[in-house]
Design a protein with these regions (language model features):
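Conserved NTP phosphate-binding and transfer environment spanning the P-loop NTPase/kinase superfamily
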Residues: 1-153
Length: 153
């Protein structure tokens, strides 16, 4: 995660520096943002942490501000030094993760830290129809977050 940092790359000038992040916002036909890239990353992380790390959704949400702080301090300042920036967002990502993510978010107690922030995100999910994860290719990057892929982690 921190391999773009000068303290690492300056001693390895031959290294190819790659920055990967789900960065795209989803826009409506008028160009208005209907689902932010940061929400997509929160959704990915919440689903993955719940399914594969045994972490409750409210715990992921409670740590989200610290995760974002770490991104801003240790990753974002160096992303422009990458030889290649890759946006790992998928146009169909929200519909595939929608059912699992909204189930986790809706089950959170209202006294969860940052719950009010989550309430501003939940209506955005309603704009998307669910797409069955069964339709995803077994080698899809999204399988990292929902499982059922052909790779072992």
């Amino acid at each position: 995660i921190h391999a773009l940092n000068d303290s690492i790359t300056l001693v390895h000038p031959e290294a190819f520096k790659l920055y990967i992040s789900a960065r795209s916002n989803i826009l409506d036909d008028d160009g208005a943002v209907v689902f932010k890239g940061t929400w997509m990353r929160l959704m990915r992380r919440t689903v993955r942490d719940y399914l594969f790390r045994g972490t409750a959704a409210q715990e992921t949400l409670a740590h989200w501000a610290n995760i974002r702080r770490g991104e801003k301090l240790y990753i974002s300042p160096f992303k422009d030094k990458a030889n290649l920036q890759f946006d790992s967002s998928f146009a169909y990502e929200v519909p595939v993760l929608n059912n699992t993510a909204t189930g986790l978010f809706n089950a959170m107690p209202s006294d969860t830290p940052r719950y009010s922030e989550l309430q501003s995100i939940l209506p955005a999910f309603e704009r998307f129809e669910d797409v069955s994860p069964e339709l995803l290719a077994k080698d899809s990057l999204l399988r990292e977050f929902i499982g059922g892929g052909k790779y072992s982690y």
